[in-house]
Amino acid sequence: MQDERPVDQLTEAEAAAELARLAEAIEAANTAYHTHDAPQISDADYDALKVRNRAIEEQFPELRRSDSPSDRVGGALAEGFAKVRHDVRMLSLENAFDLAEVEDWIERIRRYLGHVGDLLFTAEPKIDGLSLSLRYEKGRLVQAATRGDGETGENVTENARTIADLPTELDGAPDLLEVRGEVYMSHEDFAALNGRQEAAGQRLFANPRNAAAGSLRQLDPAVTASRPLRFFAYAWGAHSEPLAATQHEAIARLAALGFATNPLTRLCTGPEELLAQHAQIERQRAALGYDIDGVVYKVDDLALQRRLGFRASTPRWAIAHKFAAQLAWTQLEGIDIQVGRTGALSPVARLKPVTVGGVVVANATLHNEDYIAGRDSKGQEIRGGKDIRVGDWVQVYRAGDVIPKVADVDLDRRPEGAAPYRFPETCPECGSEAIREPGDSVRRCTGGLICPAQQVERLKHFVSRAAFDIEGLGAKQVEALWRDGWIRQPADIFELPNRYRDGMQRLENREGWGRKSAENLFAAIEARRRIALHRLIFALGIRHVGETTATLLATHYGSWAAFEAAMTRAEVGAGPEWQDLLSIDGVGAVLATSLVTAFHQEAERAAVDALAAHLTVEDAEVRAPVASPVAGKIVVFTGTLEKMSRAEAKARAEALGAKVSGSVSARTDLVVAGPGAGSKAKQAAALGIETIDEDGWLRLIGDA
């Protein structure tokens, strides 16, 4: 259920449900963008999800999830590459969308530092590509790695060596230097690459960012070498000696070492100069020849950067000031309904083709039934209450080069006789009833596994990169094999070698296949008979269970036998198994109901049992919890802290596993009170909550 009310109007239960929804949506977006190089929502929509998630966490800190999207960077790693642990984490950036948010960021920096003088900042274009870390030892490139999840990336060293403007040897560099930057593809090179792809009958790339990411993450370096990739350096990680004293001097040093750096980088003082540079770069955007989606501001003084440090997933000393979405008007020619793997009926606008930001757009998302009607299930208006009808002139926006969205409708140009759109109440694929649960904005097919669309989409999900990742069995192959009746459920995939290696029907005889490709697929299938528990749970495609949740479940239950037994015995709303499931941080009643219901549906259970018979499931790796006296506790700071700033205290507490709240409640575990502590200290005393001073806090955490 999507709740679009202001955060301060949410109850605690509503906030918890909204955080669960946001975590699922953000995780799905991260997986599509970082792991599959195939983003499914716009940058603007993604940013809105992150902003709302953080706002709810700040309002309800005690509800902050252990798998909070605010703490995550990037997505899951692809199979086929060796893993690389980053010596210095590769983090994402906080976003700003207007001058007020930039000014707020600068003010937060001043408060954190206790700084009242002028601050210098660098401003540079935010390249829309793939982050890459390059490790040089004694001046020689020894390792290249993608960002991955920020902690661990993929080793793409041999592929990176093929990038023409990336030096493999440095003269005069520190003995150890890790250079970071962005791999991208120019518009001209992207058009030429897609031309070659089309001529060869191969799939076209959606945009330059996808082309760059897909090209760098090729298992065959020869493929990468054939793709025209480029690289801009903008940062550094591990190093044996400092590059310079300031950001702009360090970038100049990288340029002197032979790296391409962005010529539009400028030194600025204060928000007015930053905004002027943002406007200047945005005016030049269309003529740059490569994609950018904003301007990055960084504190120039590296000593101040070190003092400011980091939050869980972003540096305090940098922010990305994003560009507004690109807009165009066109006519809505029709509305098509697509059915997803969970049965969701998703409306898609069929548009008269229009150019938006240099790309021809013919389709756009309409989200759901309420979005078309202009009013949600609670009667609140969407777009001022204007509904969308076939024949309307609609405003389309596109941000981040992904699926465009219909943003508005021009009622003055509505054709006479245009009828209100009636959303189907039956599934267009199988004819089953399509229902809406109370409060849900999505209508879903009730056909389950008898619905062909759900069968196909769930099979695609099953073989996706974060699930079983069976090499040689992608979405197109799944569709073709399903269409001809060769596979209907996941277990059928593991029967392919037995059924179609020999005999009258052979995989190698199908169009697009041969003996070698068939044997390669059979070998890949055999290799996946052994699977990690979290991958299997995710691969089942149960609604609300994303990658992060699957990992939480795997860690909690430890083995497939324990997980399966618990789900089988559990009853929705009652019993020890149900309570145990709800005890997992990050699992709420909605998610738990979805899990338990799936394991009690006859068709679903039969499909799971048939699949499990083919597999050896590896037990989960159990990690030791953070050893800290405040891990898992809710801490409130009040009054004046004399030995550290409030921001530093909060950062230290969170690093030790505590949750820092801005208000005292019955769930608060500890209050740290300095001079001038007022109502919060009194409230803590009234509730019997332990209260200590700053020295006591430092002794408790071992910093005295």
Curated annotation (Swiss-Prot):
| EC class | ligase
Catalyzed reactions: NAD(+) + (deoxyribonucleotide)n-3'-hydroxyl + 5'-phospho-(deoxyribonucleotide)m = (deoxyribonucleotide)n+m + AMP + beta-nicotinamide D-nucleotide
GO BP, one example? DNA repair
CC per GO annotation = cytosol
Ligand binding (Zn(2+)): 427, 430, 445, 451
Essential cofactor(s): Mg(2+); Mn(2+)
Q: Which CDD domains match?
A: BRCT_DNA_ligase_like, LIGANc
Span of the signal peptide: none
Tell me the disulfide pairings in this chain: none
Q: Which Pfam families match?
A: BRCT (PF00533), DNA_ligase_aden (PF01653), DNA_ligase_OB (PF03120), DNA_ligase_ZBD (PF03119), HHH_2 (PF12826)
> Active site: which residues?
126
Record: residues binding NAD(+): 43-47, 92-93, 124, 147, 182, 298, 322
Q: What keywords would UniProt list here?
A: DNA damage, DNA repair, DNA replication, Ligase, Magnesium, Manganese, Metal-binding, NAD, Zinc
What residue stretches are annotated with the BRCT domain?
625-704
Known EC number(s)? Answer: 6.5.1.2
Gene3D superfamilies, per the entry: 5' to 3' exonuclease, C-terminal subdomain, 6.20.10.30, BRCT domain, DNA ligase/mRNA capping enzyme, Helix hairpin bin, Nucleic acid-binding proteins
GO molecular function of the protein, one example? DNA ligase (NAD+) activity
The source's superkingdom equals Bacteria
Please give the InterPro entries that the UniProt record associates with this protein.
Answer: BRCT_dom, BRCT_dom_sf, DisA/LigA_HHH, DNA_ligase, DNA_ligase_AS, DNA_ligase_CS, DNAligase_adenylation, DNAligase_N
Q: Give the function comment from the record.
A: DNA ligase that catalyzes the formation of phosphodiester linkages between 5'-phosphoryl and 3'-hydroxyl groups in double-stranded DNA using NAD as a coenzyme and as the energy source for the reaction. It is essential for DNA replication and repair of damaged DNA.
Q: Which family does it belong to?
A: Belongs to the NAD-dependent DNA ligase family. LigA subfamily.
The name on file for this protein is: DNA ligase
